[in-house]
Amino acid sequence: MAAYTAIDDPEAYFQAEAYTGTGSTRTVTLSADTDMQPDVVWIKKRASNYNHNLFDSVRGVNKGMYVNNDAVEHDSNADGYLSAFSSDGFQVQAGSSTSDYVNVDGETYVAWCWKETADAGFDMVTYTGNETARTISHSLSAVPHFMTVRNRTATNDWLTYHHKNTAAPETDYLYLNLDSATQDQDIQWNDTAPTSSVFSVGTSGYTNGNTDGHIIYLWTGKQGYSKFGGYTGNGNADGAFIFCGFRPAFV
């Protein structure tokens, strides 16, 4: 294993966990063999059309963002929230009016959990926008393959970069929360590719809104653990086969 990848234990950096809500304080313990304190927890109620809720250790507990829409960062007290990150999981709490989003009694949920570390190719950066094209440092020590950024205080969509999106991906972007096709604007990434130490933003309110708080999540591929690529569909019932070099836990 070590000859193929430096990550011998992927469960130390990513785990997916299904759990059932209790309607009150609920400690969710990750069931894999390896203990992991997550830095990002993305929660979805499985049987209903409620929003995807994202929490992270940089913004802090009880600060949710919906991955599937453009709502601003919210205090989740009313609808249930993540109240703590633990050494091997997290804690969810019922809200003051309902617990629908994370912890309804008897309802099933899935949580995708990441550990922030350059070893596994994942970083988070918060910054304040200034509407001036510039570079911002990250800690991956490698070129990001995938980035998604969110203006925390404005009703903007999730601006997303993928290194295989087009021949010149730094000139283009996708929306994580919309089904729109690829778009081209230099005001998003300033038409500048990210490097092993910085990423670029332009003058857009999506990536660099003046005085607005932003958070960006950055990943780079790690052989045997994560991969960010593209494929061409073939229209066949069996579909196209996409080789990752490992069995993925999250697609």
Name each region found by the language model:
Residues 1-250:
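Surface-exposed molecular-recognition determinants
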